[in-house]
């Protein structure tokens, strides 16, 4: 079975990309366990707690990330450089994601057959 990586690289609520990516991830998790989730660039903002999407008339889908355990999604990484650039090194995110430096993150991403970017 092919290994599938989901890469979140956009900020939440500015577009539907993050919500669509999360929906696709959860649907795919019903078909395979060979999944990895990566948060890079502005995608690290997807995991911030306490967001107020109603202020921009958007749906609050961020809490849905907390369902990763229920869906057996446990391979989750976040770019350490992206965290530093945005001053988010000491934040408690809504899911447990392992910080990786860019070289290690690219190496891990190279272990996947299919990469879907949102």
Curated annotation (Swiss-Prot):
Keywords annotated in UniProt: Cytoplasm, tRNA processing
What SUPFAM superfamilies does this protein's entry cite?
DsrEFH-like
Q: Does the keyword Cytoplasm apply?
A: yes
Q: What is its main location?
A: cytoplasm
Q: Which InterPro entries does UniProt cross-reference here?
A: DsrEFH-like, Sulphur_relay_DsrE/F-like, Sulphur_relay_TusC, Sulphur_relay_TusC/DsrF
Q: Where in the cell is it found?
A: Cytoplasm
Whether Cytoplasm counts among this entry's keywords is: yes
| Biological processes, Gene Ontology terms | tRNA processing
A GO cellular component annotated for this chain's UniProt record is: cytoplasm
Question: Record's family?
Answer: Belongs to the DsrF/TusC family.
Summarize subunit and interaction data from the UniProt record for this chain: Heterohexamer, formed by a dimer of trimers. The hexameric TusBCD complex contains 2 copies each of TusB, TusC and TusD. The TusBCD complex interacts with TusE.
The record ties this protein, via NCBIfam families, to: PRK00211.1, sulf_tusC_dsrF
| Functional description taken from the UniProt entry | Part of a sulfur-relay system required for 2-thiolation of 5-methylaminomethyl-2-thiouridine (mnm(5)s(2)U) at tRNA wobble positions.
Q: What is this protein called?
A: Protein TusC
């Amino acid at each position: 079975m092919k290994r599938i990586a989901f890469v979140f690289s956009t900020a939440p609520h500015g577009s539907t990309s993050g919500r669509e990516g999360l929906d696709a991830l959860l649907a795919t998790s019903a078909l395979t366990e060979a999944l990895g989730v990566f948060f890079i660039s502005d995608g690290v903002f997807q995991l911030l707690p306490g967001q107020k999407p109603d202020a921009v008339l958007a749906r609050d889908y961020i809490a849905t990330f907390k369902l990763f355990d229920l869906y057996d999604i446990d391979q989750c990484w976040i770019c350490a450089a992206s965290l530093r650039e945005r001053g988010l090194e000491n934040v408690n995110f809504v899911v447990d994601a392992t910080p990786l430096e860019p070289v290690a993150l690219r190496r891990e991403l190279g272990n996947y057959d299919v990469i879907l970017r949102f």
